[in-house]
């Protein structure tokens, strides 16, 4: 049953739904291994040395390479839900929760910076490529020490993206279904792409190359986790024999049900009980 599917989503670089605990008072707690800090706090204290940037990026991609083939998309990746301990082990948390939130409701700032342009441009159709965009933003922030696209609101968010990447390409504009959005995009000043080398003078060629592949305006052209992890930049860590892929599609169908929150708790609870028996 579903318990099985969750069990298969156990992975070293992910804090899974199995670590959720529901108290008798119906509060949901997340039991996380005590990981010393998160990437947001780490980045605000000091610049990261290149070997750490590489190792952290590698572990994030290793997690995505595992879950994406199972049809699981995080949708809300940002430095504060990337947990890191003193051995530099990295785990992504809040997988599965992003699904419970209506993307239009999560307008708070920290998330917006890392949100892929197609989420703002089309709302309906988006897939695992949104996670790659978010990781690209986090990668840039690890290199540069500050958020790459600090938008003040939705509109400004798209503007700061076009200031670096240039105007959205035709094939992206053609996917926009909302007339209002289309008008907004057409009204944006036409911009040329700024060379990444110019924007990130401290980055080396391999970093620039991978970053450009992750921050592609077009989600269909954006590099996948499986391809990104094989990029020469990550060669020091890449080990095909130690990068598992989830072996079945994950059943999130219960997430689409329109249920009151207290019922959610029960469902999640039963999922976890089924699984912990194994």
Curated annotation (Swiss-Prot):
Pfam families: Pkinase
Top-rank taxon, per record: Eukaryota
Location of the protein in the cell: Cytoplasm; Nucleus
GO function term, MF aspect, one: ATP binding
Chain span(s) of sequence motif TXY: 106-108
Location (main, coarse): cytoplasm
Positions bearing Phosphotyrosine: 108
InterPro entries associated with the record: Kinase-like_dom_sf (IPR011009), MAP_kinase (IPR050117), MAPK_p38-like (IPR008352), Prot_kinase_dom (IPR000719), Ser/Thr_kinase_AS (IPR008271)
Domain Protein kinase: 1-234
SUPFAM superfamilies associated with the record: Protein kinase-like (PK-like)
Enzyme Commission code: 2.7.11.24
GO CC terms in record: cytoplasm; nucleus
Activity regulation (record text): Activated by tyrosine and threonine phosphorylation.
Comment, domains: The TXY motif contains the threonine and tyrosine residues whose phosphorylation activates the MAP kinases.
Family the UniProt entry places it in: Belongs to the protein kinase superfamily. Ser/Thr protein kinase family. MAP kinase subfamily. HOG1 sub-subfamily.
Name under which the protein is recorded: Mitogen-activated protein kinase HOG1
Organism: Wallemia muriae
Gene this protein is translated from: HOG1
